[in-house]
Amino acid sequence: MAPLLEVNDLSIGFGNGPSVVDGVSFALNAGETLALVGESGSGKTLSCRSVLRLLPDAAQMRGGSIRFNGAEGAVNLLSLPEKKMRAIRGDRISMIFQEPMRSLSPLHRLGDQVAEVLRLHRNMGRRAAKRAVLEQFEKVGFVDPMRAWKSYPFEMSGGMRQRAMIAMAMVAKPELLIADEPTTALDVTTQAQVLGLIRSLQAETGMGVILVTHDLGVVANMAQRVVVMNKGRVMERGDAQEVLGSPAHPYTAKLFAAAPMIPAVAAPAPASPKPAD
């Protein structure tokens, strides 16, 4: 069976400068978690945003292909017309971004923002969309889904906003989820809950997950395979436990020696929206 996603020889640059993503290749199977690991500026996020063609305006796609072998057939995402690409974003492929406050509108209630995904991609009416969103809110751990629906992002803590982003990414039941540093700025307990939530939703749906992180504890707990990046290039790839236990590349060994760890992933705990501290 073909991988769910195949990224081949991807190169991205800005202006006349050198490629900041240089010949990157990796593959992801359905139901699998692949971790992209590296320091800030290594090209992890750009590589992932290229899957959804959400690069900065000044970025140039210089080469490569991204093949998505989803349920509706295989496509090269880089050659699709923008109209067809819009139909894939947030539907068959979803992304959890690093900073929820930048991704959520401060002017609209959370429920309306998540329901918009279903109205856009599933052509649902307001009542059907609301039922589906409330169900998703319950799945991601909101004790009071209706309260979450009525809340504005600024009324929620960081952990609650991240749960909301997971709900938005998952409500259309994507085949592929990209999670870009999903636990950034969260306390250790909330980190474990968010990661446990992603893992439980993956077990339920069978989706593939690309997890962008610099935290080796996250890799050890979540990923089956790992790709290590530095300065836009792949340094090492392989089975996560093998690479963690015995890195082959000197850069990988150096990175791992300085990397932070977190406790094992806990089961997602129920939560309700509350004002941020």
Model-derived features: positions:
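ABC ATPase "signature
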Residues: R237-G238, S246
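ABC ATPase NBD Q-loop/coupling interface
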Residues: S65-A87, V243
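Conserved ABC ATPase "signature" region
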Residues: N69, A128-R147, F256-A257
